[in-house]
Amino acid sequence: ISRVGHSVDQQLLYIAERLFIDDSEVQRNPKQNLGGWVSGGDIKYKNLPDVNGNYDNVIDSNDRQYTGMPTTPEIVYGFGPSLRYKKFDFSFFFQGAARVSIMMNGIHPFGADGTRNVLQFIADDYWSDTNQDIYAGYPRLSKRDNENNTKASTYWQRNGAFLKLKNLEVGFNHKFFRVYLRGSNLLTFSPFKYWDPEMGSGSGLSYPTQRVFNVGVQFSINK
């Protein structure tokens, strides 16, 4: 699915370079007119040229571009066999998606707006005065929503491709009954580690996909 210039659901984003290491670096770089007061630990965006190739040294809505994979998968696939050997049967089904991005948004721990839960990756890796990591997984913490850091940008864009073992079933067949064990959502392989990639974009704090196990007996009655 496409439109002129880019794919449908490809995101128009600011290009994040990294985080500012301190306040003095903020002053040495193009002014970021995206709202709020920009400080050390905030996201540093790339200044893009205009149609004439000129730089205005101001970061605003003109410094966005369509980039990355769309948030709707370009490829959705699945596969799985059903096998039988003597009295045993076995089946499984893998489901996957490729060429898709996840946009992380709505995450604002300790703030007065948005979702205030603290995800583990934030607790483990955020910028602070004692951890001035310009590639930290989360910018500096703030009491109020920091507009500079919540703009849709490549800082929050992730590879959302995944391959999931959706169903697996093992059965034993007797003359009058069949006993089976079935599992759903058993394994997920993905470069995205923050939440179930099948949930898609957002904060990851909606109800997760459940892992389910069933044991059952099927009877057959011959007249």
Per-segment meaning from a language model:
Residues 73-77, 157, 161-166, 209-213:
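Residues that define the transmembrane beta-barrel architecture of outer-membrane proteins
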Residues 8-12, 97-178, 183:
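Extracytoplasmic gating/loop element in the C-terminal half of outer-membrane beta-barrel translocons
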Residues 87-90, 176-177:
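Repeated loop/turn-to-beta-strand initiation elements of outer-membrane beta-barrel proteins
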Residues 80-84, 171-173, 206, 218-220:
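Transmembrane beta-barrel domains of outer membrane proteins
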Residues 1-69:
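Conserved small-residue
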Residues 92, 179-181, 217:
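Membrane-embedded beta-strand positions of outer-membrane beta-barrel proteins
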Residues 85-87, 96-100, 167, 183-190, ...:
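Transmembrane beta-strands of outer-membrane beta-barrel pores
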Residues 1-29, 125-137, 150, 188-223:
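C-terminal beta-signal and terminal closure region of outer-membrane beta-barrel proteins
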